Amino acid sequence: MNKIPMTVAGQIALDEELKRLKTIERPAVIAAISEAREHGDLSENAEYHAAKERQGWIEGRVQELEDKLARAQVIDITKMSGDTVKFGATVTVLDEDTEQESTYQIVGEDESDVKSGKISISSPIARSMINKEVGDVAEVNAPGGLKSYEIMSVSWG
């Protein structure tokens, strides 16, 4: 069973989504199915079919979240330190072609949000930075060709 790395914040977000699905979404869709059944012929009842489809999605997502949480390897980044890039690190890099600095935090799959600077541990740029230190150059095979990023700083928390 493969562990899924995530930050404490990532675990909390998945827990909250699971709780919302179980306590709010699931009962609401059951009520919608019940109400749609009262409208008679189910074969041509669009409300019923939409509610059943929504129920299937909710149940699938509940199972997915329960599985991810069961396999979670929660990493408390506030207890980490050092200049080596690892999961949870916030890394400032310098694009050697454009001289533009960017800052990324390396997080779990479900936490990634490029717009807010959070990149997945499995993304090419994150994989290229892992185990590098300040001053090292990470090379990434990007769609436009090879990109080189110098690690400027590594911080935690």
UniProtKB/Swiss-Prot annotation:
Coiled coil: none annotated. The keyword Transcription applies. PROSITE patterns: GREAB_1, GREAB_2. InterPro entries: GreA/GreB_C_sf, TF_GreA/GreB_CS, Tscrpt_elong_fac_GreA, Tscrpt_elong_fac_GreA/B, Tscrpt_elong_fac_GreA/B_C, Tscrpt_elong_fac_GreA/B_fam, Tscrpt_elong_fac_GreA/B_N, Tscrpt_elong_fac_GreA/B_N_sf. Pfam families: GreA_GreB, GreA_GreB_N. Keywords: DNA-binding, Transcription, Transcription regulation. The keyword Transcription applies. GO terms for biological process: DNA-templated transcription elongation; regulation of DNA-templated transcription elongation. One of its GO terms (molecular function) is RNA polymerase binding. Necessary for efficient RNA polymerase transcription elongation past template-encoded arresting sites. The arresting sites in DNA have the property of trapping a certain fraction of elongating RNA polymerases that pass through, resulting in locked ternary complexes. Cleavage of the nascent transcript by cleavage factors such as GreA or GreB allows the resumption of elongation from the new 3'terminus. GreA releases sequences of 2 to 3 nucleotides. Belongs to the GreA/GreB family. PANTHER family: TRANSCRIPTION ELONGATION FACTOR GREA (PTHR30437:SF4). HAMAP family: GreA_GreB. This is Transcription elongation factor GreA. It comes from Maricaulis maris (strain MCS10) (Caulobacter maris). The lineage of its organism: Bacteria, Pseudomonadati, Pseudomonadota, Alphaproteobacteria, Maricaulales.
